[in-house]
């Protein structure tokens, strides 16, 4: 990426082939453009990463914003999230589970609120 991202989204990937497509599409369809997507493969035994790469083909404008990292061994959620946080380049970091999906304006709204309020942390609920 040529400019610093406003938001880095860390998405752990392990055993979610039934859910990950919906998650990816909701992330790639965000109205906020300056996003770094960090998908971390925790040595998933299923086709989750193949699905990710296939869905990426539908969003060529997002390809340069995507990092796919494979852990050396299955390390668990804490280690995966830590790797993501240590390698994120965005002003803000968001953790998104790979079986979740979000509204298309969610991260833009959260980023704008953080900037408006000068907040270090923004939290939200779900509907």
Tell me what each language-model feature is.
Residues 1-127:
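Nucleotide-sugar donor-binding/catalytic module of glycosyltransferases
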């Amino acid at each position: 990426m040529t400019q610093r991202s406003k938001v880095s989204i860390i998405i752990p990937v392990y055993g979610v082939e039934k859910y990950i497509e919906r998650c990816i599409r909701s992330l790639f369809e965000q109205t906020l453009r300056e996003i770094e997507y960090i998908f971390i493969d925790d040595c998933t035994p299923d086709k989750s990463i193949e699905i990710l790469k296939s869905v990426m083909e539908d969003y060529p404008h997002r390809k340069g914003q995507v990092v796919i990292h494979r852990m050396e061994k299955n390390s668990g959620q804490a280690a995966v999230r830590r790797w993501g946080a240590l390698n994120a380049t965005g002003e803000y970091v968001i953790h998104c589970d790979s079986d979740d999906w979000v509204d298309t304006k969610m991260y833009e709204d959260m980023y704008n609120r953080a900037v408006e309020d000068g907040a270090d942390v923004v939290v939200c609920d779900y509907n």
